[in-house]
């Protein structure tokens, strides 16, 4: 998927694109981060981790099944945040805190007090599910390094590729 294709991917059923949504998340998060009284070192550390998590958090929405869901197909179901984790684990060197933030941005982990939870089995089983084709049909052509590189190039953030 090239840059122009990825810029037109929808993130919300109201037509908001993934790029627009991610830019809004980054802008809002950076304002919040700047409002905190933190040392320069802490600020820099949190900013780097936040930017990586923000840029990656909804990347799984490029998956064709998620796009079908946005188009109204009620039978299409996919955990886009787990696909986002798959991209990060497959192609990037990202720390566990960033992966955790991406994986749990819609659901908390089982041990928390929130009503919606993501089980550790969900997190541990993501690679197995993807390998078995449950999330990523190989014929779709969106789940590749080119898609990730196009996406990251929009934000000019430095990530270390595997």
Role assignments for model-derived ranges:
Residues 2-162:
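Accessory nucleic-acid engagement/destabilization modules that flank
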